[in-house]
């Protein structure tokens, strides 16, 4: 995986997968106030519309995480890989049909919790 010989054999504590997700696949999200909003597929720009994409990272369900975090001593620690979220700007519509830019939560990493 790595071209640097010093880094060969390095593994993450938790396995993750990352992918581009379209607003068509996302449909809804939670905004900063905790409200569920509709994620709009297209964003209006001066020359038409652009599709909305989000780069999401989450824990890999097929990875090592079933037995806890890699490298954590199971006899002494109860560990778990968990997907965490961050806020990103998205073009959305709220329950009152108000359209605009809001911060929504998306999956952004896989971390080890003890």
Curated annotation (Swiss-Prot):
User: Cellular component GO terms, alphabetically?
Assistant: axon; cytoplasm; dendrite; extracellular space; perinuclear region of cytoplasm; synaptic vesicle
Location of the protein in the cell: Secreted
Q: Quote one Gene Ontology molecular function term.
A: growth factor activity
Q: Which cysteines are joined by disulfide bonds?
A: 14-81, 59-110, 69-112
Any GO BP: nerve development
Q: Does the keyword Metal-binding apply?
A: no
Tell me if Methyltransferase is a UniProt keyword of this record.
no
Q: What does this protein do?
A: Promotes the survival of neuronal populations that are all located either in the central nervous system or directly connected to it.
Its family remark reads:
Belongs to the NGF-beta family.
Q: What is this protein called?
A: Neurotrophic factor BDNF precursor form
């Amino acid at each position: 995986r790595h071209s640097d010989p010093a880094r060969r054999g390095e593994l993450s504590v938790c396995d993750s997968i990352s992918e581009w997700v379209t607003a068509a696949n996302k449909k809804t999200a939670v905004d900063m106030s905790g409200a569920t909003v509709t994620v709009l597929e297209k964003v209006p720009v001066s020359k038409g519309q652009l599709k909305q994409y989000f780069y999401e990272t989450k824990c890999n369900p097929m990875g090592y995480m079933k037995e806890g975090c890699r490298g954590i001593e199971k006899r002494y620690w109860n560990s778990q890989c968990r997907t965490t979220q961050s806020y990103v700007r998205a073009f959305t519509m709220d329950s009152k049909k108000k359209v605009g830019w809001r911060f929504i939560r998306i999956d952004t990493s896989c971390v080890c919790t003890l």
